[in-house]
Amino acid sequence: MIPNDDDDANSMKNYPLNDDDANSMKNYPLNDDDANSMENYPLRSIPTELSHTCSLIPPSLPNPSEAAADMSFNSELNQIMARPCDMLPANGGAVGHNPFLEPGFNCPETTDWIPSPLPHIYFPSGSPNLIMEDGVIDEIHKQSDLPLWYDDLITTDEDPLMSSILGDLLLDTNFNSASKVQQPSMQSQIQQPQAVLQQPSSCVELRPLDRTVSSNSNNNSNSNNAAAAAKGRMRWTPELHEVFVDAVNQLGGSNEATPKGVLKHMKVEGLTIFHVKSHLQKYRTAKYIPVPSEGSPEARLTPLEQITSDDTKRGIDITETLRIQMEHQKKLHEQLESLRTMQLRIEEQGKALLMMIEKQNMGFGGPEQGEKTSAKTPENGSEESESPRPKRPRNEE
């Protein structure tokens, strides 16, 4: 049975090499199919676990034929390991299978590290990537190998997503495996394509930046000049104000006129839009009603005069209202006085009526009392008559 299948590789993980396995491997040398399959699935580099597996190989073989077969196997294995690493096979198939790097691989670790070189693994002197120094294997990549391998990886891969993922994995593995001395060179090599790609964009972006900077400087200078011009005060003469009023009237009044349109209609040198804007604002706040053009210009008033006239008119209106209010108050007082006099007259008339009524009552009550008294007097007389008079003695003389 030829050990070129994945099942055999998995079985080799659980069963380390011994004398019988070495003899069996001696009787089954590698053929062309196995060599092609191993070329398609080469190892990336010698892992650290491989150094521990080397202790499993017996230090000596009983027969010279077995030693020669073992040396040939080791030489082929070293040639395969010395080749550059490809993450994908040449036919664009699946990723190569490495049984030594799987998580289920149990490798016995030796407690003591022997600095002496390994006796039965031959490392050729012409290997570009492996150097034996004090029993420690350091992986050193030449600067010329990385760009070629990186270009081959990009050209052979068809999927852009896969290429980006493999590129990230490549950067991580190279960063962890390389020494501190080679880190700057590797980073410069990796960043070299990016710098080449970024050069055209930077050249293209220089002109818009320059234009924007120049436009910003022009805008700043224009704004400074406009601010300086706006800060400069201007005296509005009556003639200039007349031109301003004519322009406003032509544009349809102060509510519809704009500073830009007024400036175009006025056509006065040295006059800026800021002056027109401020004057138009004052003109609107003053609520100036322009006199028709038929009137003489002498009858027209300035905004300040119009404001004073408006104030006087408002004062006159206020005084007029106060005067009217005082008149109403006077009328009210007069009405109140008339009401009081009427009340007094009514009271007097009432008293007079009462007096008259009493007099009438007194007039009607006098004859009745006389009758009563007369009635009383005859009764007294009758009584007196009825009463016996004392008899006087008669004189017989």
From Swiss-Prot:
Its organism's taxonomic lineage begins at: Eukaryota, Viridiplantae, Streptophyta, Embryophyta, Tracheophyta
User: What are the boundaries of the region Coiled coil?
Assistant: 319-339
One biological-process term from Gene Ontology? regulation of DNA-templated transcription
Q: Which gene encodes it?
A: PHL4
What spans are recorded as compositionally biased (Basic and acidic residues)? 386-397
Task: Spell out the GO cellular component terms annotated for this protein, sorted alphabetically and separated by semicolons.
Answer: nucleus
- The UniProt annotation gives the DNA-binding region as 259-284
SUPFAM superfamilies named in the record: Homeodomain-like
Note whether DNA-binding occurs among the keywords: yes
Annotated region (Disordered), positions in chain: 1-27, 359-397
Protein name in the entry = Myb family transcription factor PHL4
Q: Tell me, according to the record, the phenotype of the null mutant.
A: Separated male germ unit (MGU) with all nuclei separated from each other making a wide triangular figure.
| Record PTM Phosphoserine, positions in chain | 387
Q: Which UniProt keywords apply?
A: Coiled coil, DNA-binding, Nucleus, Phosphoprotein, Transcription, Transcription regulation
- Pfam families, per database record: Myb_CC_LHEQLE, Myb_DNA-binding
Highest taxon of the lineage: Eukaryota
Q: Which GO terms describe its molecular function?
A: DNA binding; DNA-binding transcription factor activity
Q: What does this protein do?
A: Transcription factor involved in male gametophyte development.
The short sequence motif called LHEQLE sits at 332-337
Q: Which InterPro entries match?
A: Homeodomain-like_sf, Myb_CC_LHEQLE, Myb_dom, Myb_dom_plants, PHR1-like, SANT/Myb
Primary residence? nucleus
**Could you tell me where this protein is found in the cell?**
Nucleus
Ranges for domain HTH myb-type come to: 228-288
Q: Which family does it belong to?
A: Belongs to the MYB-CC family.
